[in-house]
Swiss-Prot record:
The lineage of its organism: Bacteria, Pseudomonadati, Pseudomonadota, Gammaproteobacteria, Pasteurellales. Keywords: Cell shape, Cell wall biogenesis/degradation, Isomerase, Peptidoglycan synthesis. The keyword Cell wall biogenesis/degradation applies. The gene is murI. Pathway: Cell wall biogenesis; peptidoglycan biosynthesis. Pfam families: Asp_Glu_race (PF01177). This is Glutamate racemase. It comes from Actinobacillus pleuropneumoniae serotype 3 (strain JL03).
Length: 265
C-alpha cells in the first residue's frame, strides 16, 4: 500500500513541509490543499480555523482514504489539532515553532521567533517558550507581510528586498541574536535572503526535517511491486481566482498532476 498523506495550509508555504516529507517518503501518495479563500490564516479567528480544518479534511477524506493529515501551517497547528484528532481516527501531525531545538543550539541564549502575528500571540507558543526556553531571551517578530512576500516569490521568482528588510530591520543590529526560528512554513523559502540580511545569525531552524521524521515514524511505507491506479498526486484550492492557472503550473512543477477546486457544496 502507498500511504496517502494530505497536507494543507492557507497558501503554498506548506510545500516546504511536503518537500521534506517527500524526500523521506518518495513513494507515498500526496494530496495538498491550499485554502486560498481564507488566506492568510493569521488574519482569521480560531473558530474559523477549526471550522475550515474540519471541512477540508472531511471533504477530501470522502473521496480519498487518508492515512495521515499534516497541518502544514504553524498558525493553524496552534489551534486546530485537538478538534481534528477528536473527529478523525488517522494520525494528525502539526507544525509548531521549533522552540526546543532553537533553545538547545543557541550559544548566546538569544533566539528570534519569526512567525505570523497569529502564531506569535498564541498562548500555546508562550507555553512552549516557558517550557523549553526559560533560560533564553526570545525576540519575536509577527508578520503577515513576509507570508505575502513568499507567495509572491513562488509566483514570480522575485522577492521585494525593501519590504523584506522592513520586516526584519530590528534584528539587523541585534548584538546577541544567534538563532532564528522560521516559525511559518512559508519562511524557509526565503531562508537564503534572510541569511544575507542577518549575517550574525548562525542558525536558522526549519521544522521540515523534524516533521518528516515524525511522519515517517508514524507510517510504515511499503513500495508496491506494480504501479497502483488512481494514485496521482493532486492539489486542491478553495477559490478560483486570476492566479489559478499560474498556480496549477507551479503545483505541477512540485509534482502534482493537476489543481482542482475543492467544492464544499
Amino acid at each position: 500500500m502507498k500511504p496517502t498523506i494530505l497536507l494543507y495550509d492557507s497558501g503554498m508555504g506548506g510545500l516546504t513541509i511536503y518537500d521534506a516529507i517527500r524526500q523521506t517518503l518518495p513513494n507515498a501518495h500526496y494530496l495538498y490543499c491550499f485554502d486560498n479563500a481564507y488566506f492568510p490564516y493569521s488574519e482569521r479567528s480560531e473558530n474559523v480555523l477549526i471550522e475550515q480544518a474540519v471541512k477540508i479534511v472531511q471533504k477530501i477524506a470522502e473521496k480519498y482514504p487518508l492515512d495521515m493529515v499534516v497541518v502544514a501551517c504553524n498558525t493553524a497547528s496552534t489551534v486546530v489539532l485537538p478538534a481534528l484528532r477528536e473527529k478523525f481516527a488517522f494520525p494528525i501531525v502539526g507544525t509548531v515553532p521549533a522552540i526546543k531545538p532553537a533553545a538547545a543550539i543557541s550559544q548566546t541564549k538569544t533566539i528570534g521567533l519569526l512567525a505570523t502575528k497569529g502564531t506569535v500571540e498564541r498562548p500555546y507558543v508562550a507555553e512552549l517558550i516557558e517550557k523549553y526556553a526559560k533560560d533564553c531571551i526570545v525576540e519575536k517578530i509577527g508578520t503577515t507581510t513576509l507570508v505575502e512576500l513568499v507567495e509572491e516569490k513562488i509566483r514570480t521568482g522575485q522577492v521585494d528586498q525593501e519590504r523584506l528588510i522592513e520586516v526584519i530591520a530590528e534584528w539587523q543590529t541585534h548584538p546577541t541574536l544567534d538563532t532564528v526560528i522560521l516559525g511559518c512554513t512559508h519562511f524557509p523559502l526565503v531562508k537564503q535572503e534572510l541569511q544575507q540580511l542577518l549575517p550574525n545569525v548562525k542558525y536558522f531552524i526549519d521544522p521540515g526535517n523534524g516533521i518528516a521524521n515524525r511522519v515517517s515514524a508514524l507510517l510504515s511505507e511499503s513500495v508496491p511491486e506494480e504501479p497502483e491506479q488512481n494514485k496521482e498526486n493532486i492539489a486542491f484550492c478553495t477559490k478560483i481566482d486570476e492566479e489559478f492557472f499560474k498556480r496549477e503550473v507551479i503545483m505541477q512543477q512540485w509534482g502534482f498532476k493537476r489543481l482542482e477546486l475543492l467544492n464544499f457544496l
